[in-house]
Amino acid sequence: MRGGTVLLILILLLGVIARSPMTALAAASILALSYLGWGGLLEWIEQNGVDTGLIMLTLAMLAPFATGKVGLREVLLSFASLPGIIAVIGGVLATNLNKRGIDLLSGEPQIIVGMIVGSLLGIVLFGGIPVGPLMAGGLTALILQIYGWLSK
């Protein structure tokens, strides 16, 4: 059994134990695609999965505009409120962290397992929600940068 397969089985088991259906389903899906010999699809997922996932997430965030649940008036009013202004600042900070996460994951893909384990611990211990490795990667990059500053 290849090392990658063992890791995927371990992640699948951790996902089940931690009651993280997204993690378990993702690991099981990749294992199934691997065993079915669908290497081309695996390569496509590896190359395009993050962008595709971000598109789906963005679609979900924009859907309320199309359904009429959020209109121009609500958007304009949100910019005039403290929570709305803080949300804009939060969006700026989050996108910066997400970019750092992508950079970290691109340069050090082996760090993904630690982030998955950390995400699962966050689910089990704190009732967290795994929204993906980008924010975890961004926070990891930020913590590593702070550690680098402090260790000088």
Curated annotation (Swiss-Prot):
UniProt GO cellular component terms: plasma membrane
Annotated InterPro entries: UPF0756_TM
Keywords per UniProt: Cell membrane, Membrane, Transmembrane, Transmembrane helix
Pfam families on file: DUF441
Location in the cell: Cell membrane
Membrane-traversing stretches: 6-26, 52-72, 75-95, 111-131, 132-152
Membrane topology: Multi-pass membrane protein
Family: Belongs to the UPF0756 family.
PANTHER family: UPF0756 MEMBRANE PROTEIN YEAL
UniProt protein name: UPF0756 membrane protein Helmi_09930
Species of origin: Heliobacterium modesticaldum (strain ATCC 51547 / Ice1)
Native organism taxonomy: Bacteria, Bacillati, Bacillota, Clostridia, Eubacteriales
